[in-house]
UniProtKB/Swiss-Prot annotation:
Keyword DNA-binding assigned: yes
Gene Ontology molecular functions: DNA binding; orotate phosphoribosyltransferase activity
Protein name per Swiss-Prot or TrEMBL: Transcriptional regulator GfcR 1
Alphabetical UniProt keywords: DNA-binding, Transcription, Transcription regulation
Family: Belongs to the purine/pyrimidine phosphoribosyltransferase family. GfcR subfamily.
Record organism: Methanosarcina barkeri (strain Fusaro / DSM 804)
Length: 204
């Protein structure tokens, strides 16, 4: 996407295809607030100031299995470094649906670990208090296991926090989080180290 108008058009298109705010935010790698702003702006309603956000388009990586493989190797290298520093191991790599899945499955293979899939609650337009995401039963279990969480982008950190809390409630031990891009700029979330290939820091 080259400009705001492209983002607005894509947000409207995704909404017309039935995606809700959280799913659109995940697809465009922006916050829910930015999606709301884009959709409001598309209707030419009262102009609100643009949220401070950055859109990340990593489709040139995502469309190539070869590129995904090499990126997953780089993420594995960072995770192994973190595990060595913290004297921890990995039993399960947890991919956050949907964009964390391809990287997580390749990383699990490389690390000789099981693969688990996490469905976040952010895909729902209205999230009720106490509502949680889920670990898919079709993949590896996490109870009592050392886990590495993999996603594409950290925007606010809320999804990462959700996954960490859910894993802990299930008796798992989150040991590290690996992402392509960290827009939050955090070293840790809930005492779990964050490792990213790219960290974005706003100077305003």
């Amino acid at each position: 996407m080259k400009n705001i108008e492209d983002l607005i058009q894509k947000a409207v298109e995704l909404q017309s295809n039935g995606l809700v705010t959280g799913q659109i935010a995940d697809e465009l790698n922006v916050s829910r607030e930015t999606v709301t702003w884009l959709l409001t702006r598309s209707k030419k309603e009262v102009a609100a100031p643009a949220p401070k956000d950055i859109s990340v388009n990593w489709s040139n990586i995502g469309k190539s299995a070869t590129r995904l493989h090499y990126i997953s190797l780089a993420l594995c290298d960072m995770v192994l470094e973190t595990l060595e520093e913290t004297n921890a191991e990995v039993d399960v790599v947890v991919g956050v649906a949907a964009s964390g899945i391809p990287l997580a499955s390749m990383m699990a293979n490389e690390l000789g670990a099981d693969f688990a899939l996490y469905h976040s609650r952010k895909g729902q337009d209205v999230v009720q208090p106490g509502q949680k995401g889920t670990i898919s039963r079709n993949f590896g279990g996490v109870a009592g296991k050392n886990c590495v969480i993999v996603d594409d982008v950290i925007t606010t950190g809320s999804t990462t926090m959700e996954v960490i809390e859910q894993l802990r409630e299930m008796g798992a031990k989150p040991r590290a989080v690996a992402v392509l891009v960290d827009k939050k700029g955090a070293d840790m979330i809930a005492n779990v180290p964050i490792r990213s290939l790219v960290r974005i820091v706003r100077l305003d």
